[in-house]
Amino acid sequence: MTMEAKAILRTARISPQKARLVADQVRGLPAERAVNLLKFSDKKAAHLIKKVVESAIANAENNQGADVDELKVQTIMVDEGPTLKRFMARAKGRGTRILKRTSHITVVVGAAK
């Protein structure tokens, strides 16, 4: 049985398209290197994903007694969450909808083989 730990952040206020840009950079990296890469990224998604990766690492450490140095990011998924619909007033009494998109970020870390 492989050792895996999972962490999920639901309804994060960032569009899935923007979050996937950062998630693609981290997928498959060793856990320590992934956290380091996210720490120095300027993107908003990097901060959110870093928290989820750190949570998954802590879950592996505390729940399964895993060694942090052996962990790697096995799976990272960014799924679409519920969309908040807002209204913006426009000229001549019209209005347009603003879609404030949210994401569900799932990270699975496991022992590197």
Curated annotation (Swiss-Prot):
InterPro entries, per database record: Ribosomal_uL22 (IPR001063), Ribosomal_uL22_bac/chlpt-type (IPR005727), Ribosomal_uL22_bac/org-type (IPR047867), Ribosomal_uL22_CS (IPR018260), Ribosomal_uL22_sf (IPR036394)
Any Gene Ontology biological process: translation
Keywords, in A-Z order: Ribonucleoprotein, Ribosomal protein, RNA-binding, rRNA-binding
PROSITE patterns: RIBOSOMAL_L22
GO molecular function, one term: rRNA binding
GO cellular component, one term: cytosolic large ribosomal subunit
The protein's assembly and partners: Part of the 50S ribosomal subunit.
Family matches, as NCBIfam families: rplV_bact
Protein name, as recorded: Large ribosomal subunit protein uL22
Species of provenance: Stenotrophomonas maltophilia (strain K279a)
Lineage, top ranks: Bacteria, Pseudomonadati, Pseudomonadota, Gammaproteobacteria, Lysobacterales
